[in-house]
Amino acid sequence: MIKRRDRKELRRKRHLRVRSKIKGTPERPRLAVYRSERHIYAQIIDDIAGRTIVSASTVDKELREKLTKTWNQEAAKEVGKLIAKRAAEKGIKKIVFDRGGFKFHGRIKSLADAAREAGLEF
């Protein structure tokens, strides 16, 4: 059985490996996703300028009022819709998806699918 500490270390290694290949540009910024046990966070980042353009998470006041649970796939879908809406307001349509070393299933996949349905292309 893999210990929690080892799992986190393996995820960090996967994330570093992916980050060495993926860069966000002003034309195609990076959608970075982080998943904790209770919440899910998403940011659209321009790596060249080194700044976050838009962000959304289950901690946002806008979503906290709507959600009963913040750690399920429904919450991840809401975050995906919200990040896509905020990106559209800033004129962002195409992005590069950075899963942050997490497996592409469950909450990460739900967030990505909801963002695609709401208009982001990746």
UniProtKB/Swiss-Prot annotation:
A Pfam match: Ribosomal_L18p
Keyword Transport listed: no
Keyword Ribosomal protein belongs to the record: yes
InterPro entries: Ribosomal_uL18_bac-type (IPR004389), Ribosomal_uL18_bac/euk (IPR005484)
CC per GO annotation: cytosolic large ribosomal subunit
Gene Ontology biological process terms, A to Z: translation
Record's keyword terms, sorted: Ribonucleoprotein, Ribosomal protein, RNA-binding, rRNA-binding
GO MF, one annotated term: 5S rRNA binding
Protein role: This is one of the proteins that bind and probably mediate the attachment of the 5S RNA into the large ribosomal subunit, where it forms part of the central protuberance.
Family label: Belongs to the universal ribosomal protein uL18 family.
Subunit structure of this chain's protein: Part of the 50S ribosomal subunit; part of the 5S rRNA/L5/L18/L25 subcomplex. Contacts the 5S and 23S rRNAs.
Protein name, UniProt field: Large ribosomal subunit protein uL18
Organism: Kosmotoga olearia (strain ATCC BAA-1733 / DSM 21960 / TBF 19.5.1)
